[in-house]
């Protein structure tokens, strides 16, 4: 009889351990947009200055700061991080952001690498600082005037795509709203 109780105890202990392990591994990534700053610039005699009209805009740039918390007991990954500009119906433009931590210089010019896959340790918070931009040449800014929503997308360790809203604004009225 004691042998049967011992076997049942072992089986129940194994099942309980498996359940507790599964529960502790069942977590997810929480993304918080700490800051989003975008601006339009134009070239005034060799110097980039803030723009006040759609017609003068030559450059568009953004800076994004993300706080990412992994609530799981296992490391999580973010791959193929992309910024999506949308008009509520379809994607207008995709941008792979540059990672501020990869800055390197050549002379007086700074360069940055595209964001690489990011591993987030278990029960940890990391901060990402990203940026990118567009130039008006070859209709490079046409998409922005049709934009109504901006998203960040990434793929997780199971290649599932997740979409996070960053900003909702009608960019056709950008300069009227930002005087």
Predicted features along the sequence, with ranges:
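Membrane-aqueous junction of the first/signal-anchor transmembrane helix
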Residues: 1-166, 170-179
């Amino acid at each position: 009889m004691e042998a049967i109780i011992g076997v049942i105890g072992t089986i129940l202990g194994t099942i309980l351990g498996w359940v507790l392990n599964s529960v502790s591994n069942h977590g997810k990534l929480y993304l918080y947009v700490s800051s989003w700053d975008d601006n339009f610039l134009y070239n005034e005699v060799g110097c980039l200055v803030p723009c006040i009209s759609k017609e003068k805009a030559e450059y568009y740039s953004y800076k994004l700061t993300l706080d990412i918390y992994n609530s799981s007991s296992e490391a999580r990954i973010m791959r193929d991080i992309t910024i999506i500009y949308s008009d509520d119906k379809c994607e207008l433009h995709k941008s792979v952001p540059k990672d501020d931590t990869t800055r390197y210089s050549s002379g007086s010019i700074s360069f940055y690498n595209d964001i690489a896959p990011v591993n987030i340790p278990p029960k940890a918070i990391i901060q990402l600082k990203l940026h990118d931009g567009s130039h008006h040449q070859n209709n490079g800014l046409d998409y922005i005037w049709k934009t109504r929503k901006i998203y960040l997308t990434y793929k997780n360790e199971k290649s599932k795509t997740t979409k996070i809203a960053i900003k909702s604004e009608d960019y056709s009225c950008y300069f009227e709203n930002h005087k």
